[in-house]
Design a protein with these regions (language model features):
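Short secondary-structure boundary/capping segments
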Residues: 1-2, 32, 97-100
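Single conserved hydrophobic/aromatic residue that forms the stacking wall/gate
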Residues: 2-12
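A residue-level signal for beta-strand positions that form part of recognition/binding surfaces
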Residues: 7, 39, 105
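A generic structural signal for short
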Residues: 10, 17, 54-55
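Periplasmic peptidoglycan-binding/anchoring modules of Gram-negative envelope and division proteins
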Residues: 13-43, 67-72, 77, 108-112
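Periplasmic OmpA-like peptidoglycan-binding domain that tethers envelope proteins to the cell wall
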Residues: 45-112
Length: 112
């Protein structure tokens, strides 16, 4: 399973890392420091509201916020790629606040 974490929650229309997200990223940074050959892809996702273009840009900002946070813990930027799916890959297909909350996320995936 290449997927490492999901659900790094974000606030609507923002790329804010929650307290729980920061803790998850700290643990990932610690693991990555011990496994220096591993690279990761940070995927940014958005809910269904907004245009495709807007949500792709928002997903990229979310993934970059996670990347910046990992870098503050000493993980080199050349080990981290960023990819935005915008609203194209929801984890919940519902059209309600709970589904939207689940779909606003960053996901860390092991690249190798």
């Amino acid at each position: 399973d290449r997927q490492w974490s999901r659900g790094l929650g974000d606030v609507y229309k923002r790329q804010v890392l929650t307290t729980a997200s920061r803790e998850t990223l700290r643990k990932q940074a610690s693991w990555l420091r011990k496994n220096s050959k591993i690279t990761v892809v940070l995927e940014g996702h958005a809910d269904e509201r907004g245009t495709r273009e807007y949500n792709l840009a928002l997903g990229e900002r979310r993934a970059n916020a996670a990347k910046d946070y990992l870098m503050t813990y000493g993980i080199s930027s050349d080990r981290i790629s960023v990819l935005s799916y915008g609203k194209e890959r929801p984890v919940d297909s519902g059209s309600n606040p709970l589904a939207w909350s689940k779909n606003r996320r960053s996901v860390t995936v092991k690249a190798n």
